[in-house]
Amino acid sequence: MTEKEKMLRGMLYAPARDETLLAELAACKAQCQQFNQRAYQAEGIESAQMLLRRLLGAAGEGLRIEPPFWCDYGWNISVGRNFYMNHGGVILDAGGVTFGDNVLVGPQCGFYTSGQPLDAAKRAQGLEYAYPIRVGSGVWIGGGVRVMPGVSIGDGAVIASGSVVTKDIPAGVLAAGVPCRPIRPITAADRMLP
């Protein structure tokens, strides 16, 4: 089994030992760099967004990502319709990241599917793991949020700025903290606010 196959199955894998993974990482970094350069030029905004569509595994209508943006592979990211990510987004997508429709992501957010074992000997061997992240539809993620490997965020949830999401968050709640936890349901009264 290749290191890439292990990665995609959620097993420990060594990315530095797989020429395919190394080549894909390098190609993705070059594409991200190209996107970031074009997106800062007024005449390059449209071509930058087209680059994103080629980079990502799947993207619905209304895709908008502000530069700078970085990801590991790109092909392992799927975004629904009307996806918006503000400046400074990072998606480490080895385990796969899926966003539903109408998702808003604040500035300086990170989605990290990759992690290293707690065992120092395994880390010294260059091993890591990757677990998928799933973000439902209608989710708003505030600035500076970090989402850790294997987490799911339910439809309509709001994640407060600065949170570190280490466990699943149910649908329809306001969640906050380090570690992030549900604070309260989003109610009809919340829908009355501007």
Residue spans for each PLM region:
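Short-chain dehydrogenase/reductase
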Residues: W140, V158, L174-A176
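Flexible glycine-rich beta->alpha loop in the catalytic core of nucleotide-sugar glycosyltransferases
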Residues: C109, Q116, S163-V164, P170
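Terminal amphipathic alpha-helical/low-complexity segments used for targeting or macromolecular assembly
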Residues: M1-G62, C180-P194
